[in-house]
């Protein structure tokens, strides 16, 4: 696990040290706050695993989330046309972000998912590390925001995504 702390003022570092073990290593890095996209770029450079999965500090993973992602990754491990695994995001009240879905699995580009199949809502993406390293976010002085859609739309031009209809991420959005 790589944890990039980009400016928290709480006890995140102490908490990580408390969770660390040889079976559950956490690599903690504290960097100045230059925006989420910069923190993601930093984490990508440190990543050594096969898949890169982003979890925001104020969100949670439901039980069996990582297990479900690993199961899905095994289904497509030999298919190099698929670079992204997408489970579904749910609100903490149990509703799926974007409403209910009527599929179990679908393989398509992120652009087709939204514009051809008209599926709404955010998903929780795990990206092959070898692929995401080719598509870093642009970084500009004094710019602290870059939409994640930029990254996924760039990847969608060359690769497909394996979408699976399971809750792997719990979130709340600011309104």
Residue spans of the language-model regions?
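Acidic donor-diphosphate engagement hotspot in glycosyltransferases and nucleotidyltransferases
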Residues: 12, 40, 61-69
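Short aromatic/hydrophobic "clamp" motif used to bind/position activated sugar donors
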Residues: 52
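Conserved nucleotide-sugar donor-binding catalytic segment
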Residues: 91, 95-175
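Conserved donor NDP-sugar-binding/catalytic core segment of glycosyltransferases
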Residues: 64-99
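A conserved acidic beta->alpha catalytic loop
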Residues: 5-14, 56
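Short beta-strand/loop segment that forms part of the nucleotide-sugar
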Residues: 1-7, 27-32
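Glycine-rich, basic loop-to-helix element that forms the pyrophosphate-binding segment
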Residues: 31-47
């Amino acid at each position: 696990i790589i944890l990039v702390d980009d400016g928290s003022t709480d006890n995140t570092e102490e908490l990580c040290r408390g969770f660390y073990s040889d079976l559950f290593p956490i690599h903690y890095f504290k960097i100045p706050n230059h925006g989420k996209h910069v923190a993601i770029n930093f984490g990508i450079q440190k990543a050594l695993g096969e898949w890169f999965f982003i979890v925001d500090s104020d969100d949670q993973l439901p039980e069996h989330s990582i297990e479900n992602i690993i199961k899905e990754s095994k289904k497509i491990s030999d298919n190099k046309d698929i670079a992204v695994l997408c489970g579904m995001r749910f609100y903490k009240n149990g509703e799926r972000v974007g409403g209910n879905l009527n599929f179990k699995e679908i393989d398509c580009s992120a652009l087709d998912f939204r514009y051809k199949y008209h599926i709404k809502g955010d998903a929780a993406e795990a990206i092959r590390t070898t692929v995401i390293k080719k598509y870093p976010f642009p970084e500009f002085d004094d710019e602290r925001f870059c939409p994640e859609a930029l990254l996924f739309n760039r990847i969608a031009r060359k690769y497909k995504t394996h979408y699976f209809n399971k809750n792997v991420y719990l979130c709340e959005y600011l309104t």
